[in-house]
């Protein structure tokens, strides 16, 4: 005999929540379907567990699944599952109190917002999945008919309009063999959720990897398997590639696939892919990065940025865990210890996998580096993983024949000369600019390899690392030429006639003259021990930042002044030897000043500090005019 409908009042916190839901507008109302499907999936999981224990269930031959249908004329959306079902008491407990279908954090936040505006409280609810009650975002009446898996239990129907009360009565009419059927009578402003394409879109977005078939009007929607849940040995490269293409809409296979399954310190599984093509650090769309976070195969957040650091933001993929509640908010995610532990563990796994790739296939790693190295270098500030990060860096260097060559820091050290304890580098806009920089000449002569830092971030990376494997990073312009003299020349000996004692003294006076001519424009003028083929160069005073770093900082601070540097001249260069002869003959000869200023201006130009190229051009024209006159006189023209 059917029981008469019994009316019950919701608990206070549920009434508050339902009031806000039914009197507010939501921009993310689609989550109601995610919540209902997730509940159905949980019910099916519970049934599977019960059957695995050998317990008897009602309708054992009933196939597991979730069916969704619509009745547009009656404005009814139906979600049915063949899961564990509920008894009358379970309907009362599970659908009558928020403690069973919401979160403790939600209750606390709702209480704090009791005196706030509806909009403020609504934002609290909007940040949380609130389980079954989310259906009242779109429905003004809900009927839940459920039959438990337990033999002999009758089916019951729970009904509510979301206004404070609900009824429970024994079910009549169309009763499920087992499981739960939810009929949501949709409000007029929720008509979109009666459209098949809209329902399918929501399911593909949030629930496409649910392990049970989800059908809409008889057609299965979730046809893509949750590949990360499958044993690694059973998955082919083609399956991984197909899944990557499905996930990212890319047309090419990934460069690398990492299938992760971790049980401690936190449980999670995942698939992480290295895309075949990279992005520029400051390109459009670079802020769209992160892994998709799933909880028990249900999408919680796309592009979650807490699962990986930004320097691994080029990675695409999915992380799935059972250690998080389904209704966790985005704000709570950022502070959640489980998410933090997943991120720390996953970062170590990715770095270890890249290290294996670098060791096993240098060419494949070089391909990875050329595509993603610019973003990867942002990891210079990841102090916790510095020892794993630094060996993965790659740079072009003077060891290579062209700009395509790449060397690791370990490779550099393996080629270091005996007694060398520095990793030398120079920052430049291109390889040729670095190779032809006057300050590199002594390193070429001594057979000392120099890293070419061709990206603005490179210098930040090395300065932050400071050292590697007992070798300190040092810019070539900070080199002490006299200390470099300890290394023997590796090339042919230079054919240079040494200055006589008188010439040496005269050159010292020439240096003083040049210093007087340049005045406050320079910190000092001195003889260079680093130049071989160039007549002059500028170097930073001891302890100062490099030229490239100084220029960058001046741009940031809008400082257009020219820094005072040390002007070094090569007394063995023909220009300086000829200038010495002119100076010895007539210290006041205009050519001394013209040549000094010309050498200084060209050095400024090479260092990136020349403010007025017209002045340099005028000096060049004057010297060309004079040299033309001398040439005519010598040739008797």
Swiss-Prot record:
GO molecular function: ATP binding; ATP hydrolysis activity; ATP-dependent protein folding chaperone; unfolded protein binding
Stretches the record annotates as A: 1-330
Keywords from the UniProt entry: ATP-binding, Chaperone, Cytoplasm, Nucleotide-binding, Stress response
Coarse class of the protein's main subcellular location: cytoplasm
Region (B): 331-551
Stretches that traverse the bilayer: none
Domain of life the protein comes from: Bacteria
Keyword Chloroplast in annotation: no
Region span, C: 552-637
CDD domains: HATPase_Hsp90-like (cd16927)
SUPFAM superfamilies hit by this protein: ATPase domain of HSP90 chaperone/DNA topoisomerase II/histidine kinase, HSP90 C-terminal domain, Ribosomal protein S5 domain 2-like
Cell compartment(s), UniProt: Cytoplasm
Pfam families from the UniProt entry: HATPase_c_3 (PF13589), HSP90 (PF00183)
Any one annotated GO CC term: cytoplasm
Function: Molecular chaperone. Has ATPase activity.
HAMAP family per record: HSP90 (MF_00505)
Subunit composition and interactions: Homodimer.
Family to which the UniProt record says this protein belongs: Belongs to the heat shock protein 90 family.
Protein name: Chaperone protein HtpG
């Amino acid at each position: 005999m059917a029981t008469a409908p019994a009316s019950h009042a919701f608990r206070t916190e549920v009434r508050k929540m339902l009031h806000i839901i039914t009197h507010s507008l939501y921009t993310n109302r689609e989550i109601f379907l995610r919540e209902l499907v997730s509940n159905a999936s949980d019910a099916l999981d519970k049934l599977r567990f019960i059957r695995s224990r050998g317990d008897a269930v009602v309708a054992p031959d009933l196939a597991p699944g979730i069916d969704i249908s619509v009745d547009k004329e009656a404005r009814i959306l139906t979600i049915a599952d063949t899961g564990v079902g509920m008894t009358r008491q379970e309907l009362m407990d599970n659908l009558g109190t928020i403690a069973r279908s919401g979160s403790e954090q939600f209750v606390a936040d709702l209480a704090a917002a009791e005196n706030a505006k509806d909009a403020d409280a609504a934002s609290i609810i909007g940040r949380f999945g609130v389980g079954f009650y989310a259906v009242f975002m779109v429905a003004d009446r809900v009927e839940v008919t459920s039959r438990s898996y337990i033999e002999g239990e009758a089916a019951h129907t729970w009904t509510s309009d979301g206004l404070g009360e609900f009824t429970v009565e024994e079910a009549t009419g169309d009763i499920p063999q087992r499981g739960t059927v939810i009929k949501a009578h949709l409000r007029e402003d929720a008509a979109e959720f009666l459209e098949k394409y809209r329902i399918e879109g929501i399911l593909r977005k949030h629930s496409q990897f649910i392990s049970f078939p989800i059908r809409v009007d008889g057609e299965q929607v979730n046809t893509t398997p949750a590949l990360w849940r499958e044993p690694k040995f059973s998955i082919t490269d083609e399956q991984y590639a197909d899944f990557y293409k499905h996930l990212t809409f890319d047309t090419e296979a990934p460069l690398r696939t990492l299938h992760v399954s971790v049980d401690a310190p936190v449980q999670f599984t995942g698939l992480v892919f290295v895309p075949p093509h990279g992005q520029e650090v400051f390109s459009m769309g670079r802020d769209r990065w992160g892994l998709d976070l799933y909880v028990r195969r249900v999408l919680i957040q796309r592009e979650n940025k807490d699962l990986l650091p930004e320097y691994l933001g080029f990675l695409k993929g999915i992380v799935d865990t059972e250690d998080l509640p389904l209704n966790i908010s985005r704000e709570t995610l950022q502070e959640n210890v489980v998410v933090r532990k997943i991120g720390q563990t996953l970062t170590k796994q990715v770095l270890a996998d890249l290290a294996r790739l670098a060791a096993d296939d240098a060419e494949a790693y070089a391909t990875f580096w050329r595509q993603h190295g610019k973003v990867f270098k942002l990891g210079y500030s990841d102090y916790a993983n510095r020892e794993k990060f630094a060996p993965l860096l790659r740079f072009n260097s003077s060891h290579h024949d062209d700009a395509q060559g790449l060397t690791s820091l370990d490779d550099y050290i393996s080629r270091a000369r005996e007694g060398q304890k520095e990793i030398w580098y120079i920052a430049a806009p291109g390889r040729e600019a670095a190779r032809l920089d006057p300050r590199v000449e002594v390193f070429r002569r001594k057979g000392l390899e120099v890293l070419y830092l061709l990206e603005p971030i490179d210098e930040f990376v090395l300065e932050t690392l400071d050292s590697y494997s007992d070798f300190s990073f040092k810019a070539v312009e900070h080199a002490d030429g006299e200390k470099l003299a300890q290394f023997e020349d590796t090339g042919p000996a230079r054919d240079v006639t040494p200055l006589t004692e008188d010439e040496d003294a005269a050159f010292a006076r020439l240096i003083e003259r040049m210093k007087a001519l340049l005045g406050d424009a320079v910190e000092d003028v001195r003889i260079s021990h680093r130049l071989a083929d160039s007549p002059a160069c500028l170097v930073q005073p001891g302890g100062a930042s490099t030229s490239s770093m100084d220029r960058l900082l001046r741009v940031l601070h809008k400082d257009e002044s020219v820094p005072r540097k040390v002007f070094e001249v090569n007394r063995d260069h023909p220009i300086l030897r000829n200038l010495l002869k002119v100076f010895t003959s007539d210290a006041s000869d205009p050519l001394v000043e013209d040549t000094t200023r010309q050498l200084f201006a060209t050095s400024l130009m090479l260092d990136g500090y020349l403010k007025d190229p017209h002045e340099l051009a005028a000096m060049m024209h004057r010297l060309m005019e004079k040299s033309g006159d001398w040439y005519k006189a010598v040739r008797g023209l």
